[in-house]
Regions:
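Glycine-rich, acidic and aromatic/proline-enriched surface loops and short helix-turn segments
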Residues: 3-10, 67-68, 79, 85-89, ...
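Surface-exposed recognition segments
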Residues: 70-71, 78, 93-96, 113-184
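Short acidic, gly/pro-rich beta-turn/loop elements at beta-sheet edges
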Residues: 84, 110, 156
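Active-site phosphate/pyrophosphate-handling residues
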Residues: 60-63, 84, 178
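Short aromatic-cysteine micro-motif
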Residues: 1-70, 90-111, 183
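Structured loop/turn residues at beta-strand edges in well-structured enzyme cores
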Residues: 52, 78-81
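Conserved beta-strand positions that form and line the central face of beta-propeller blades
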Residues: 73, 82-85, 99-102, 145
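Short, well-ordered turn and helix-capping elements at secondary-structure junctions
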Residues: 87, 102-104, 162-165
Length: 184
């Protein structure tokens, strides 16, 4: 909870409003212990889309950012070696994450949106997303959407349109996150 409390304090210091609530509170000290497995209370977290604090991107926001205003297969290039850390061969599964900004950025100067680590998105997973889905994504589920692929995936999994899934309680060395803020 120390990290969450520190993050919330930074938000307040910057004059920002926290986006997430658990048990109708933005105070992490009132959220309870971070669960090690699926937990109904933590799975019921809500997001205040009008708040100006940091949050996970939606699936659609992530893809828009990854595309960088361009139409490449990967975030910044059609050649994956320009922009991503990934598994070219089976024996590369043990390479691990890499330092950011060692590859070319995309058109919005965002680095490592293809490969390196899967990035959590706010959305609950749904195989096919209907066109009338709200901007905030699918409202409920048991698995969250991941984007970008990781260092242990082959190139086809690291494209900007590829999606993965994971339970919110799962971690590991192939997942990370990128935060966004809504702008007025």
């Amino acid at each position: 909870m120390m990290y969450l409390s520190t993050a919330i304090n930074v938000l307040y210091k910057e004059g920002l409003t926290p986006c997430y609530k658990i048990k109708d509170s933005t105070d992490p000290d009132k959220w309870g212990k971070v669960p090690t497995k699926s937990d109904d209370t933590w799975n019921a977290v809500t997001c205040d889309w009008k708040a100006n604090g940091y949050r996970l991107p939606t699936d659609a926001e992530w893809e828009w950012a990854a595309r960088g205003g361009e139409n490449y297969k990967y975030a910044g290039s059609d050649d994956i070696d320009d922009v991503a850390w990934y598994a070219k061969y089976e024996y590369e599964y043990d390479k691990g994450t890499r330092e950011v900004k060692r590859k070319k950025p995309n058109g919005y100067v965002l680095y490592d949106m293809s490969g390196n680590v899967w990035e959590w998105c706010w959305d609950w997973w749904r195989e096919n997303i209907p066109s009338d889905t709200p901007a905030a994504g699918v409202p409920s589920g048991s698995l969250r959407s991941l984007r970008g692929g990781s260092w242990c995936n082959y190139d086809n999994i690291c494209s900007v349109d590829s999606r993965g899934i994971k339970a919110p309680s799962e971690g590991g060395n192939i997942t990370g996150f990128r935060v966004v803020r809504s702008c007025d």
